[in-house]
Amino acid sequence: MRILYEGRRVILEPLLTSTAVVAIGEIGDKTQLLAIVLAAKFKRPVPIILGVLCATLLNHTMASVLGFYAADWLTGTPFRVAVGVAFLVMAGWALIPDKMDDDLKTIGRGGIFLTTLLTFFVVEIGDKTQIATTLLAARFHQITLVTAGTTLGMLIADVPAIFMGEAVTKVVPLRVVRIAAAGIFAMIGAWVLLDTFRLV
């Protein structure tokens, strides 16, 4: 029975943590703003959602692979400390409001799915949620579950935005969301550091 419980925990912890971190971190993020712009321009939610899904899977798989192998190559206390500190830095970054770049407000011509796929993939590079994915993969030493969780988190945040537009960002004040995201990043960072020094 204990083995079954431990097995479920191994699966659920990286999956649920990754989903929660990215779902909250994505609200008000640049990629969510992009999803709103695409929805307003094309008014075709299905190909936009599919484009977001595919772009996120590609982008976050790459990010998870990077985190996974970085954890393999850079083992030991210094690396774990670096991961913990990185999460604390992410907590500070999460408090900074995102804005849509002016050059992304004008989306180029092309098929809706392909346009969404390309623009979303490019905008996600170096974004908070991509970096969070890399750190989560390093923390849990998982590729599949972390990628599945972060992709699900992106969809949880972006699908309502595609259907509801900017109204979705007003359901809960963005300041509250940013504080919640910062709190989650800070807790994970503290957890990693405490675990590294065997304080928990």
Where are the model-predicted features located?
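Short hydrophobic transmembrane-like helices used for membrane targeting/insertion
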Residues: 1-3
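Juxtamembrane transmembrane-helix termini in multi-pass membrane transport proteins
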Residues: 5-75, 132-153, 160
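Alpha-helical transmembrane segments of multi-pass membrane proteins
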Residues: 21-25, 55-56, 86-94, 119-123, ...
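Hydrophobic transmembrane-helix microenvironments that flank and shape a buried ionizable site
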Residues: 23-29, 56-57, 77, 81, ...
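Membrane helix-loop-helix hairpins that form the core translocation module of multi-pass transporters
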Residues: 43-112, 160-171, 176-183, 190
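Selected transmembrane alpha-helices and immediately adjacent juxtamembrane segments
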Residues: 101, 105-130, 136
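Juxtamembrane boundary at the C-terminal end of a transmembrane helix
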Residues: 191-200
